[in-house]
UniProtKB/Swiss-Prot annotation:
Part of the 50S ribosomal subunit; part of the 5S rRNA/L5/L18/L25 subcomplex. Contacts the 5S and 23S rRNAs. GO terms for cellular component: cytosolic large ribosomal subunit. It comes from Shewanella denitrificans (strain OS217 / ATCC BAA-1090 / DSM 15013). CDD domains: Ribosomal_L18_L5e. GO terms for molecular function: 5S rRNA binding; structural constituent of ribosome. Coiled coil: none annotated. This is Large ribosomal subunit protein uL18. The keyword Transport does not apply. The gene is rplR. Signal peptide: none annotated.
Length: 116
């Protein structure tokens, strides 16, 4: 089993558990160059989103593929979710290790007011 398949299996296992809870989830996806975050309802509707691809976010950053960029995205997605009335979410790391950029995004979202 290769690295990508292992990650996807971990992601499916976690998503199944989150689905049983029936709560909104904060989904994170990372690539070497960018990081993306979405708050998704149990009915699969995107309630809030932010990424380093957005022009407004990109202007704030020196580089889009580092921990500082992840912190900025975490803060912005949390602010947008709270504006929509979402304060409690489940964290879906999409099978990525809770380390580095993924952990930085989660910490920034918590500091901005999301609870998980």
């Amino acid at each position: 089993m290769d690295k990508k398949t292992s990650r996807l299996r971990r992601a499916l296992r976690a998503r199944k558990k989150i689905q049983e809870l029936g709560v909104n989830r904060l989904v994170v996806h990372r690539t070497p160059r960018h990081i993306y975050a979405q708050v998704i309802s149990p009915e699969a509707q995107v309630l809030a989103a932010a990424s380093t691809v957005e022009k407004t976010v990109k202007e704030l950053l020196k580089s889009t593929g580092n921990v500082d960029a992840a912190k900025a995205v975490g803060k912005i997605v949390a602010e947008r979710a709270i504006e929509k009335g979402v304060a409690i979410v489940a964290f879906d790391r999409s099978g990525f290790k809770y380390h580095g950029r993924v952990a930085a995004l989660a910490d920034a979202a918590r500091e901005a007011g999301l609870k998980f």
